[in-house]
C-alpha cells in the first residue's frame, strides 16, 4: 500500500511530531499536510556531506560555540502550527535541546537545490527569512556549479536580488568561513 494512502489529509504540528510516519524516509509538514521527501541523489548527498564537514571542522578549529546539524527540523515563524521543514544543514549558536524535534534559533540555513525541488526549496527559503535568528541562507545548486548566499542586512532586511557565485569562493559571514567552490564541488559529479 502506498504511503500516500495512509497519510492524514491535515495535521497540526503537534500531531505531526507525534505521528508514526509510514515507511522509511523523512517527512515535512507543509501547510498542515505531511509530505514525503525524496531521497537525495548522489550529487545532493555529496554536497551535503562536504558542506557539513567543512562547517563542522571550521567551528571546531575556531572553538566556536556554534554547532552544525544535518537535516534538522525547523518550525518557520509564519503558520508555525502547520509547518515543519527539513533543510539540508543548519547552524545554531544557541543551546540545543536534545528532547526537541525542532532546531530553535538557527543562524545559518543551507538548502541544496535540485531541479526537481526548485519551487519547494525557494518556498522554504522565504519561510526561513521570517525567522528572526536566521542571519544567512546558503543555496547550493546540483545542476551546475553555483551557490547563492543570502545575507540579512543590518536593518533586518533580505536582498531583493542575489548574485550567483559560479567561480572562486564564497564566504559565510555568519560563521566566518570562506569556501572555495572547487573544494565544495570536488567529486560531486557536477560540472
Locations of the language-model features?
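Gly/Pro/Ser/Thr-rich low-complexity, intrinsically disordered segments predominantly at protein N-termini
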Residues: 1-191
Amino acid at each position: 500500500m502506498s504511503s500516500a494512502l495512509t497519510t492524514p489529509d491535515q495535521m497540526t504540528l503537534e500531531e505531526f511530531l507525534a505521528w508514526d510516519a509510514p515507511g522509511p524516509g523523512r517527512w515535512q509538514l507543509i501547510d498542515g499536510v505531511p509530505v514525503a521527501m525524496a531521497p537525495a541523489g548522489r550529487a545532493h548527498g555529496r554536497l551535503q556531506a562536504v558542506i557539513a564537514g567543512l562547517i563542522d571542522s571550521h567551528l571546531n578549529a575556531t572553538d566556536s560555540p556554534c554547532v552544525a546539524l544535518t537535516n534538522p527540523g525547523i518550525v518557520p515563524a509564519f503558520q508555525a502550527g502547520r509547518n515543519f521543514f527539513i533543510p539540508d544543514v543548519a547552524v545554531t549558536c544557541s543551546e540545543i535541546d536534545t528532547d526537541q524535534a525542532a532546531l530553535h534559533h538557527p543562524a545559518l540555513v543551507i538548502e541544496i537545490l535540485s531541479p526537481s525541488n526548485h519551487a519547494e526549496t525557494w518556498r522554504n527559503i522565504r519561510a526561513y527569512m521570517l525567522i528572526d535568528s536566521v542571519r544567512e541562507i546558503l543555496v547550493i545548486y546540483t545542476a551546475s556549479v553555483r551557490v547563492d548566499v543570502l545575507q540579512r542586512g543590518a536593518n533586518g532586511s533580505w536582498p531583493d536580488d542575489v548574485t550567483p557565485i559560479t567561480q572562486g569562493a564564497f564566504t559565510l559571514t555568519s560563521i566566518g568561513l570562506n569556501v572555495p567552490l572547487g573544494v565544495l564541488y570536488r567529486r560531486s559529479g557536477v560540472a
